[in-house]
Amino acid sequence: MRFVKSFILMRKRETELLDYLKQRGIKQLVICGMQTQMCVEAAVRAAADYGFKVIVPHEACATRDLKFEATTIPAAQVHAAALAAMNGTYARVVKTETLIAELR
């Protein structure tokens, strides 16, 4: 198992991680982090586009309230909407305890 601090598969010029994964025959990734609707979702979509099966442990992701004009969208709603958009299309979104049980 390898942990990567920054996951940038979406930039064509940064292929070191992609090469590392492909050379080792890795087919499944677990992606988590901050800004569920930004960094996490971008990484998930890029990984799925490259053919990886992706798992997102939803309690291992987080975000913040977002503001647009006079509207504030609570972090919980932003988080849930991003997870709903990813689940079943680009990733399998699971509870962290489910993922841990599957990895044992």
Regions found by a protein language model. Give the residues of each.
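Active-site-adjacent betaalpha module
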Residues: 1-104
